[in-house]
Amino acid sequence: MKNLLLFTLFIFTLFSCEKDQNLPAPYYSIEGKWLIEGMIPDGNTMYLYEDGLRYTYYCVEGDCEALYNSYEANDGNHIPGPLNYTYENDILTVDLNFGNELVTPITFECDGGEAIFETPGYSLFRLNSGCN
């Protein structure tokens, strides 16, 4: 009787488990601090996307990473005039002013640490992601 009960429990457990083959794709946000790779000194431009505004920061010497880590949105260290942006359905739209816009599909790699801009064809790397 005990063996029958264990066998029944085993069969019930075996057939009640479903394989979840269709896991949803991870969602990555553009919000945060992003560096342009290949600038001299390396990473001398940082974009900070937050609450629909893109702030631009520059670093010309010293420890740029430590400097960028200390910056916060609208802290006065950015260049004047943050730009408006939207990010919906994997499409980034940045209002570059004077009728100009950057509209590009974005794909993410490196667990969200690299944002690949389809047009104009470059990548941004999330600050402190180690993806460069």
Task: Spell out what each predicted region is.
Residues 39-41, 58-121:
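Contiguous, well-ordered beta-strand patches that form the walls/edges
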Residues 121-132:
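Short, low-complexity, Pro/Ser/Thr/Gly-rich segments in the mature regions of secreted, periplasmic
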Residues 26-45, 83:
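Tryptophan-anchored aromatic micro-motifs
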Residues 1-16:
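Sec-dependent bacterial lipoprotein signal peptides
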Residues 52-54:
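Structural signal for glycine-centered tight turns and loop->strand junctions in beta-sheet-rich domains
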Residues 14-34, 132:
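Bacterial Sec-dependent N-terminal signal peptides
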